[in-house]
């Protein structure tokens, strides 16, 4: 049985860091229904489970609380995505960052940060003052991105506090290796 995802909160949306640079051939835009097939491929690759266009349409629908899905598109197609979702009963006053993913071939280009930041701008423009998300212990590059954007871990149980301690130590170690390398 897998553990529940770890929780993070960005307590303030008014002071976002600048967007990271990206190559001019990469466009940040809102997703359209014609992207569903490519989004299914990307999400299958990023999360290791099977997606199809029908599942994308259902998961990223207004009926599921999703207000917008953003993508980074390259000449090869959709290479990164994140969605803006609202769950007001669970997280009043906060937007929920939903399904951040990038193609394996594009990792390291900070495209996840680009689309996540766009989702945060969406939330701020909609009058929200916070954002929340859930992530997995093993997604260290994603956690590093969220920390860079100002998210803070919010343990919900004593077990979460221990898990966060391990995750943050791992992030610190890998950051040190990158700086020295």
Give the ranges of each region predicted by the language model.
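Conserved acetyl-CoA-binding loop of GNAT-fold acetyltransferases
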Residues: 1, 147-156
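Acyl-donor-binding surface of acyltransferase catalytic domains
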Residues: 1-24
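A short beta-loop-alpha structural element at the N-terminal edge
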Residues: 27-39
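Hydrophobic adenine-recognition pocket in adenosine-nucleotide-binding enzymes
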Residues: 31, 100-102, 135
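A conserved beta-strand-loop-helix scaffold within acyl/acetyltransferase catalytic domains
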Residues: 47-101
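Conserved acetyl-CoA-binding loop-helix of GNAT-fold acetyltransferases
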Residues: 102, 108-125, 144-148
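Conserved GNAT acetyl-CoA-binding A-motif
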Residues: 123-135
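Conserved beta-strand-loop-alpha-helix junction that forms the acyl-donor binding cleft
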Residues: 133-143, 159-169
